[in-house]
Amino acid sequence: MTSHGFIDESGTKDDHEVMTVALILFDGAFTAQKLHKLLIQELFPKQVKHDTKRDRRNSGLHYTDMSKSQRLKAAEILGKQPIQCFTGCFYHDGAEKSHERRFEIYTSLIELCLNDALEIHEHLDVSIAQQSNWMTYKAPLASDLSAIVSEKSARLGFRTAKFSFESAAKAG
């Protein structure tokens, strides 16, 4: 069975304390959208009830913008779901780094997450959140990730992974 996933990052700037990359895996192709809809219904019941375009525009699910009660409710809902999360992090030392160096770190964190996921899963379909200038790194990153899939296939048996790049703002 193919597991469907999404990779996104946080903290890529030098003044951020920690850079984090997460690969979230779902059992089904539409599980993320169903989960997003469930979270919206639970966290913003008035907006779902009125269901107007104006009401929906404020239903983004960014953790830092949620109240404590919304965070607890989201954790309760997510804790009951059959999802897996693979993460990697890098602690910034405060020194200024070039864009290329930050991108190397970002890439290594993605590779770490994928490597761990392929230890467990044989087939992955992964969307990667587009970062600035994503067209310039799409091909080399996909090539690096495909090399990891090949290495895991040689070591653990047949593995597949399909990669796509999607807007990070797209729900689900």
Regions found by a protein language model. Give the residues of each.
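Phosphate-ester processing/binding pockets and catalytic centers
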Residues: M1-G172
